[in-house]
C-alpha cells in the first residue's frame, strides 16, 4: 500500500513537470531507459537500493551513469529521490509515471501471444482493428508461445482475451468431463 502512495506522489509530481514543460514523451523515454538499466545492470540496482550506501555515493553513481543520458529535470528528479531516501520505490515510481503518461497520450500497451510469428501485415491489421475498437493509440508487443497450438491471446492491461486453440480444446475437454457417463450411452462393466 505504501508503494502505491509513494510512487503516485512522486510520479504525479514528475508528470506535472513533464506536462508543464511539454516534455512528456521525452521524460517517458528517459524513464524507460532508466528502468531498462536497472533491470540490465544488477550492480546499479544494488548500489542505489542498498540502505548502507551513502546518499552522496548514490548520487555520484547516478551522475556517472545518467548525467549525459537524461534531461536535467529527470536527472534532478533522480537526485531528489535519493535525497528523500525513496530509491527503493524507483521501479514503482517509473512504472506509475509511464502508466499515467500513456493515459495522457491515449496510448494502450497490448501484448499478443501467438503460436507462430505474425507477419508484418498481420501485426498491422491487428493493430488497426484494436485501434479502431478501443479508439486509442496502440503499442503492440508480440510474443511466440508454441504451447497455445494456434490462434492468439490478447492481453490489454488486466484483461485477457484468449482465442487460442489450446484454450478452446481445454474448454471442450471441461465440457465433456461434466457430462455424466450415463448420458454418453456408455455401458459400464458390472462386475
Curated annotation (Swiss-Prot):
One of its GO terms (cellular component) is proton-transporting ATP synthase complex. Belongs to the ATPase delta chain family. It comes from Halothermothrix orenii (strain H 168 / OCM 544 / DSM 9562). InterPro entries: ATP_synth_OSCP/delta_N_sf (IPR026015), ATPase_OSCP/dsu (IPR000711). It is found in: Cell inner membrane. It is a peripheral membrane protein. One of its GO terms (molecular function) is proton-transporting ATP synthase activity, rotational mechanism. Its main location: membrane. F(1)F(0) ATP synthase produces ATP from ADP in the presence of a proton or sodium gradient. F-type ATPases consist of two structural domains, F(1) containing the extramembraneous catalytic core and F(0) containing the membrane proton channel, linked together by a central stalk and a peripheral stalk. During catalysis, ATP synthesis in the catalytic domain of F(1) is coupled via a rotary mechanism of the central stalk subunits to proton translocation. Keywords: ATP synthesis, Cell inner membrane, Cell membrane, CF(1), Hydrogen ion transport, Ion transport, Membrane, Transport. F-type ATPases have 2 components, F(1) - the catalytic core - and F(0) - the membrane proton channel. F(1) has five subunits: alpha(3), beta(3), gamma(1), delta(1), epsilon(1). F(0) has three main subunits: a(1), b(2) and c(10-14). The alpha and beta chains form an alternating ring which encloses part of the gamma chain. F(1) is attached to F(0) by a central stalk formed by the gamma and epsilon chains, while a peripheral stalk is formed by the delta and b chains. Gene3D superfamilies: N-terminal domain of the delta subunit of the F1F0-ATP synthase (1.10.520.20). The gene is atpH. This is ATP synthase subunit delta.
